[in-house]
Regions:
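Enriched for short, Lys/Arg-rich terminal
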Residues: 70, 74-101
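Short, hydrophobic secondary-structure boundary micro-motifs
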Residues: 31, 53-55, 96
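Basic/aromatic recognition patch in beta-strand/loop cores that engages polyanionic ligands
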Residues: 40, 47-81
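Structural signal for well-ordered, non-membrane alpha-helices
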Residues: 16-19, 39-46
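Arg/Lys-rich, positively charged N-terminal/basic patches that mediate binding to nucleic acids
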Residues: 1-35
Length: 101
């Protein structure tokens, strides 16, 4: 069963901020490589959303491979929806996204 991904507005803002930061870096194609990595993570989520561990109550956390970012999300099994709560750097404190739930 495949799930559909929905982003909270704040998660969209997180992603926009991250992409902007990578675009400004002097390394060639860094933003493009990040987009590829996070897109791969989203595809995995759609196919196997329960493959990632629960971090807090009903919130799961997916790691973006090769990048220091975590995707926080919760599932709505009834509507087969993945609700992306936040996309944050691993060094950020959980309080930064917990208030979004």
């Amino acid at each position: 069963m495949s799930y559909t991904i929905q982003f909270l507005p704040e998660a969209t803002d997180d992603l926009t901020e991250i992409l902007g930061w990578y675009k400004e870096q002097p390394v060639t194609d860094l933003q493009k490589k990040f987009i590829t990595a996070i897109s791969t993570t989203f595809k995995t989520l759609e196919k196997s959303p329960k493959s990632y561990a629960l971090r807090f109550k009903n919130v799961r956390c997916a790691i973006v491979k090769k990048y220091p970012y975590l995707i926080y999300y919760w599932l709505d099994d009834a509507s087969t929806t993945i609700n992306i709560v936040a996309i944050l750097h691993q060094s950020r404190h959980p309080k930064n996204w917990k208030k979004r739930i």
